[in-house]
Amino acid sequence: MNSENALLQSDILAYLEQHEQKDMLRFLTCGSVDDGKSTLIGRLLHDSKMIYEDQLAAITKDSKKSGTTGDKVDLALLVDGLASEREQGITIDVAYRYFSTDKRKFIIADTPGHEQYTRNMVTGASTCDLAIILVDARAGVKTQTRRHSFLVSLLGIKHVIVAINKMDLMEFSEEVYENIKKDYLVFSEQLDIPDIQFVPISALDGDNVVNKSENTPWFEGSTLMKTLENIEIGNDANIDDFRFPVQYVNRPNLNFRGFAGTVVSGQIKKGDKITALPSGKQSTVRSIVGFEGEQEVAYTPLTTTITLEDEIDISRGDMIVKSDNLPLQSSAYEVNLVWMDETPLMPNKQYGFKFATKFVPGSVTDIEHQIDVNTMEHKEAVRLNLNEIGVGKIKLTQSVACDPYTKNRETGAFIIIDRLTNSTVGAGMVIDAIQDSGTKTEYSEFELEFNTLVRKHFPHWNATDITKL
């Protein structure tokens, strides 16, 4: 039992107050098959004293049936929750685990290492601040390592810890560690990952995971847990660009009209000049109302309600920004695309696009190229299949305000929705806006009448009014 659990049992109020003050780090583990991702998470939980006795007894029993570690307790069984995963000894789903230490709270996403589960990894990585990339000390930097690193870079994760695992099988050789470190740094020069750190570990035995290992006297860095506790992520937040997607109009009575939502980046204070998009109408912040009443300032990631001096038309899906700091605004964008559905992405097919709180119909008009996630080569493509990634152009039925994903992960991301099944079939990241050409398609009388007929008698098809395209 760690000190936190002891405090929890003795003084629940003191525990809650202490817990409330900690910041949170979201991170994912990724690596090739059998690199030890689930074992590492189990080791972090075990050595941090975050496993209860009944859990330990259960996995000790299960280790004899499903374990892969001989006489040792298979800590990977703490995370591999699905029966099919245990039987195959692999991770399929994205498994989330929550734990905390005296310094920080953590959410771990254990993501699949297989290429056919790329969409699962993208889902797990989309909300993370840091990635732990496991490398098998016996194999070094492999194709899968490059693929995972590319995906981490694509999704805007700025901090990477390369955990060189199974060092016990290489007799904790410093030469092996340095060679892998050198190979990875050479490869990573073509990626946008500003902070890369390395740790030699043995997840099975716990070397350099939570406790410093006596087997690596040549390693002067911190253990994996200490690195996770001390890494600074506060500077990653976008505090310059105020973006406030409106979730709903809050009107409890005739005397109050506010706009509720989450500050996804930046900050706002009373008296600031704002612009509502897409209308472009301007006003001034009258008040900011939070859970405990009025406040002078609101900043990311607070959920709040903003009232304005002027009665301007704002509804769900609109975005409130500072008048002197406007985002991109266009109905056409160049984007990175990740396809997540078994039915391929087909250009010019109508989909739904969801940017923050705004839903707008549109289509992918062009696939410029597909990106080979293993080699990062660009290939010609006329469609994207399940788990494939590409660069393309989207055309929306109305203008949408957003930022490049590299500048703002919250307003630069979107999901693609199948309008018949309402399932999420893809995800995207904005690269840049494409200026509208101003040309308008001419439709025949028959096309106009047919479009009107479909929208009138088959509203569940969600057909777009082509006169507004």
UniProtKB/Swiss-Prot annotation:
Reactions catalysed, as given in the entry: sulfate + ATP + H(+) = adenosine 5'-phosphosulfate + diphosphate
Biological role: With CysD forms the ATP sulfurylase (ATPS) that catalyzes the adenylation of sulfate producing adenosine 5'-phosphosulfate (APS) and diphosphate, the first enzymatic step in sulfur assimilation pathway. APS synthesis involves the formation of a high-energy phosphoric-sulfuric acid anhydride bond driven by GTP hydrolysis by CysN coupled to ATP hydrolysis by CysD.
Region (G3): 110-113
Protein name: Sulfate adenylyltransferase subunit 1
Disulfide pattern: none
Chain segments carrying region G4: 165-168
First-level EC class: transferase
Region annotation G2: where it falls in the sequence: 89-93
Superkingdom, natural source: Bacteria
Keywords assigned: ATP-binding, GTP-binding, Nucleotide-binding, Nucleotidyltransferase, Transferase
Subunit structure: Heterodimer composed of CysD, the smaller subunit, and CysN.
Annotated family: Belongs to the TRAFAC class translation factor GTPase superfamily. Classic translation factor GTPase family. CysN/NodQ subfamily.
Chain positions covered by the region annotation G5: 202-204
Annotated metabolic or biological route of this protein: Sulfur metabolism; hydrogen sulfide biosynthesis; sulfite from sulfate: step 1/3
Record keyword Chaperone present: no
